[in-house]
């Protein structure tokens, strides 16, 4: 078991420890449970799906990197597939606070990067901030998305974000988590860049059209990709680097182990992620970063 989970694991009931232990003891446990695993844990622990999501919040919060606030937030995104995806806040020193990944963003992007096509519910240990409410409003099924908080009745997102501004106000009908491929190509590039290109092709950028993706390779040889997730309100948009760093953190790898990175974006786009990605990666100790342009 990854050391970050040890204290939180001890908070669980004995039956839940017995059911969950073999799963999180796996060296490759990546802070998610498949639908079959969720069902098996529910049966063994005598919990329903929503109760299990609440019970897992301490484990999700244990993934937080809250070096500035020291405030750990955990979230569980329940996919339409039945899978559970952990999320946790992630803060970065030496750059702007705007680079922070919020726990709800973390769980949603985690699900998206694992090719989930929609969410039933997001369970979180603290009330979602306005930033996160707006971020979740970009989802295809935002109208039916349930928000679940300890000590409160479940409520749909619109309860927390009434009279919302969203994609429909900008005549946008392609939404976050839709299955999309922009079809861009690059010639004569390495495997890492091809993964960054694939991420760019699956990014959500209907407002700026500035599709972008990134791929990070660690010292262990693992590769983590990130896609740009744009938002109708602009500021809650999640850059591709943050999406990749979040996936890496949830998988239990230290961002300081990144050795190589590749950024792919559209040439002459109105939005570029290159400069801030380069700065943040340098702060993490990675200076071997390739930059590739998709031609118009």
Swiss-Prot record:
Zn(2+) binds at residues 102, 129, 132. The lineage of its organism: Bacteria, Pseudomonadati, Pseudomonadota, Gammaproteobacteria, Enterobacterales. This enzyme scavenges exogenous and endogenous cytidine and 2'-deoxycytidine for UMP synthesis. The keyword Hydrolase applies. SUPFAM superfamilies: Cytidine deaminase-like (SSF53927). HAMAP family: Cyt_deam. Residues 48-168, 187-296 form the CMP/dCMP-type deaminase domain. Binds 1 zinc ion. It catalyses: cytidine + H2O + H(+) = uridine + NH4(+); 2'-deoxycytidine + H2O + H(+) = 2'-deoxyuridine + NH4(+). Substrate binds at residues 89-91. PROSITE patterns: CYT_DCMP_DEAMINASES_1, CYT_DCMP_DEAMINASES_2. GO terms for cellular component: cytosol. Homodimer. It is an enzyme of class 3 (hydrolase). One of its GO terms (biological process) is cytidine deamination. One of its GO terms (molecular function) is zinc ion binding. Its cofactor is Zn(2+). It holds the Pfam family dCMP_cyt_deam_1. This is Cytidine deaminase. Belongs to the cytidine and deoxycytidylate deaminase family. The active site is at residue 104. Its EC number is 3.5.4.5. Keywords: Hydrolase, Metal-binding, Zinc.
